[in-house]
Amino acid sequence: MNKHERLDEIAKLVNKKGTIRTNEIVEGLNVSDMTVRRDLIELENKGILTKIHGGARSNSTFQYKEISHKEKHTRQIAEKRFIAKKAASLIEDGDTLFFGPGTTVELLAEEVNHHTLTIITNCLPVYKILLEKQTAHFRVYLIGGEMRHITEAFVGEMANAMLEKLRFSKMFFSSNAVNKGAVMTSTLDEAYTQQLALSNSIEKYLLIDHTKVGKEDFTSFCQLNELTAVVMDYEDEEKVETIKTYIEVVD
């Protein structure tokens, strides 16, 4: 096994397991401890993993740093636009909708061109997009409260008190990570607000691109099998099939 093959194998192992110990690599690949340590440093420099005491953890499995709203606008835009167009086809005139925070939902807001809708959101960028379309029959409401600047979403007691009184025919929301059937986000505040909206919605649609599948985040706020369907891209068929073991994926 040459160096390139060895680095590739170590990357596959750490991404599959999430974390791996140095001695596991030594025994599995039959190489020296010093060789493994050099390989881990090289893979860390490439951004594939992070060295930890006695081993390494995958950078693709756990989202240790919450990505800012600005950064999200530069990632998987083509996939997100594909998802948004597909999600828009699920909306019908007369619906009362809840739109959660996230760049994919913002793109959905751009796609909406229905005549008669009521849309409630706790996300400022989503609200600004929809407000441009407001008419006597196309009504848009922003739920207030404490704003999280990294996502520009309103959460907390005030937002939750308003949500408790509302009911929706459909909810469209996104997530930072989906793993083993759990849908995850970065904070307890956003998790609880999303849970409230979900509990008050008849149909529930999760919008995610393929990069979110297999990742983990701080807390889960629902399970895939509690939803109506998932709307996602087909860039990674294996990940689509993984989601299909829990819930329908919209064609």
Curated annotation (Swiss-Prot):
- Listed InterPro entries: Carb_Metab_HTH_regulators (IPR050313), DeoR-like_C (IPR014036), DeoR_HTH (IPR001034), NagB/RpiA_transferase-like (IPR037171), Tscrpt_reg_HTH_DeoR_CS (IPR018356), WH-like_DNA-bd_sf (IPR036388), WH_DNA-bd_sf (IPR036390)
Q: Which UniProt keywords apply?
A: DNA-binding, Lactose metabolism, Repressor, Transcription, Transcription regulation
**Does the record's keyword annotation contain Zinc?**
no
What GO molecular-function term can you cite, just one? cis-regulatory region sequence-specific DNA binding
What is a biological process (GO) this protein takes part in?
lactose metabolic process
Q: Which residues form the HTH deoR-type domain?
A: 3-58
Instruction: Specify the DNA-binding region ranges.
Output: 20-39
Q: Which superkingdom?
A: Bacteria
Any idea what job this protein has? Repressor of the lactose catabolism operon. Galactose-6-phosphate is the inducer.
PANTHER family given for it? GLYCEROL-3-PHOSPHATE REGULON REPRESSOR, HTH-TYPE TRANSCRIPTIONAL REGULATOR SRLR-RELATED
Name of this protein = Lactose phosphotransferase system repressor
Organism of provenance: Staphylococcus aureus (strain NCTC 8325 / PS 47)
Upper classification of the organism: Bacteria, Bacillati, Bacillota, Bacilli, Bacillales
